[in-house]
């Protein structure tokens, strides 16, 4: 039976450190502020925004919410971002994705000042991750690295397989593992003989978006399996990994919920703190 990698425990440790540093900055007269923009009324996005606000309050970070109508124009949205870029009390800006179809997401991401881009989606920050000289890391991959380190799972020299090549998880995840001297393979929908590749992984990261996609026969004995998937089925949250069978074979596994999910918001808070420190010369 696998050891459960508890993201709630790791997230609590990260948030505790952030809260301490926010207090320390407060004693120096520096506040930390995060602006969250939500366009439209996507229910899942509303839940994420609510959770971010709650976590900000817990850690002493000021939360600024901008709730815009789903019909807002791209130019109006970019104009708001421009205002926030120039507002000293706001250290981080996050525009909740997905955006309505009439708005170009990349144009909006590019409008956010790179030093306030706490999601690390701006092309400048993506480029910095590529060369290993980064200020911010995308929250989910950074959270996964935090989990691996917290539980002492060795990365250097290991075979790591990432299933999924999204800009939000798959690609940056592979770069972070590479920077830690792992041998990394990225798999996707066109990968041939997927099972042959994944069953060689010491660390397997599943970011596919299909419930129960990874089965026991795809996993190496003693592997660490990281499940990024959040799939809803009849009100139940399911990961990309078939937990019951894979947990009998892997040495380590993250559950869904309670694995990677809690880390994403914790790392967002850490990025916001980093932004505040940089903007105030700390």
Predicted regions and their residues:
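Short beta-strand elements in bilobed, periplasmic/extracellular small-molecule ligand-binding domains
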Residues: 34, 56-70, 184-186
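Anion-binding alpha/beta catalytic cores of soluble intermediary-metabolism enzymes, centered on
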Residues: 95-155
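Glycine-rich phosphate/diphosphate-binding loop of Rossmann-like nucleotide-binding domains
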Residues: 39-53, 135-224, 236-247
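Short glycine-/small-residue-rich Rossmann-like dinucleotide-binding loops
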Residues: 98, 207-210, 229-230
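Rossmann-fold NAD(P)-binding glycine/threonine-rich loop
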Residues: 106-122, 126, 229-279
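Short, well-structured alpha-helical segments in soluble
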Residues: 76-88
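Positively charged, low-complexity intrinsically disordered leader regions
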Residues: 1-30
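Short beta-strand segments enriched in small/hydrophobic residues
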Residues: 31-40
């Amino acid at each position: 039976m696998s050891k459960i990698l508890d993201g709630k425990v790791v997230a609590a440790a990260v948030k505790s450190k952030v809260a301490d540093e926010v207090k320390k900055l407060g004693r120096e007269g520096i506040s930390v502020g995060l602006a969250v923009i939500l366009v439209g009324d996507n229910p899942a996005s509303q839940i994420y925004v609510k959770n971010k606000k709650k976590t900000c309050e817990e850690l002493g970070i000021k939360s600024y919410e901008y709730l815009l109508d789903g019909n807002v124009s791209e130019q109006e949205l970019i104009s708001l971002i421009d205002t926030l870029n120039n507002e000293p009390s706001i250290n981080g800006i996050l525009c909740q994705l997905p955006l309505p179809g009439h708005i170009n997401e990349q144009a909006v991401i590019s409008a956010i000042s790179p030093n306030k881009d706490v999601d690390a989606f701006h092309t400048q920050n993506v480029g910095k991750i590529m060369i290993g000289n980064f200020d911010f890391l995308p929250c989910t991959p950074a959270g996964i690295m935090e989990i691996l380190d917290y539980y002492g799972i060795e990365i250097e020299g290991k075979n790591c397989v990432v299933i999924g090549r999204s800009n939000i998880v798959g690609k940056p995840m592979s770069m972070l593992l590479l920077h830690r001297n792992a041998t990394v393979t990225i798999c996707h929908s066109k990968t041939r003989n997927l099972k042959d590749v994944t069953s060689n992984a010491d660390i397997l990261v599943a970011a596919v978006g299909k419930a129960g996609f990874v089965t026991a026969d795809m996993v190496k004995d003693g592997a660490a399996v990281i499940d990024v998937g959040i799939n809803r089925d009849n009100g139940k949250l399911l990961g990309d990994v078939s937990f019951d069978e894979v947990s009998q074979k892997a040495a380590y596994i993250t559950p869904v919920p309670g694995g990677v999910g809690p880390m994403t918001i914790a790392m967002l808070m850490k990025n916001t703190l980093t932004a505040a420190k940089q903007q105030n010369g700390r």
